[in-house]
Amino acid sequence: MNWRSERIWIELITGSRKTSNFFWACILFLGSLGFLLVGTSSYLGRNLISLFPSQQILFFPQGIVMSFYGIAGLFISSYLWCTIWWNVGSGYDQFDRKEGIVCIFRWGFPGRNRRIFLRFLMRDIQSIRIEVKEGLYPRRVLYMEIRGQGALPLTRIDENLTPREIEQKAAELAYFLRVPIEVF
């Protein structure tokens, strides 16, 4: 959801609470739980999962390896669930032409730097930059070039914008901020 008026432009950024992250976290959790159960059932010599007979899987080396993969998968799955729970990467971009201030806010991981808040003056913005890399894995990223700060990404790398969409977004933002567009 975005909100724009003549003087203020607010763009909400979706973080890690995306459908694909939920999907992969569920798949990884269920798969690693299955591996751990098969490894445990081969150790105990009993069937914990009725789909696989545990007598066919020896504990050494297959059961140990499956248990290791199950534990590793549970750790990775818990990491994914934590990023979803904390909504890492979400936030907003606020461009206020009336005050001449740009505010960029993102949620990070818990700790001292959980809230990432950048604030700078509009007159420090040099340009809006589009970086395009074509090929097998095309990448189109929109940056804001800031004097003394470098380039600040405004779109996510995994956001698959078409060339038309990224040009449209860059043109609208450059027009709103009254800065030039650079293409790399």
Curated annotation (Swiss-Prot):
It holds the Pfam family Ycf4. It comes from the Eukaryota. It is a multi-pass membrane protein. Its main location: plastid. It is found in: Plastid, Chloroplast thylakoid membrane. One of its GO terms (cellular component) is photosystem I. One of its GO terms (biological process) is photosynthesis. Keywords: Chloroplast, Membrane, Photosynthesis, Plastid, Thylakoid, Transmembrane, Transmembrane helix. InterPro entries: PSI_Ycf4_assembly. The keyword Lyase does not apply. Seems to be required for the assembly of the photosystem I complex. Belongs to the Ycf4 family. This is Photosystem I assembly protein Ycf4.
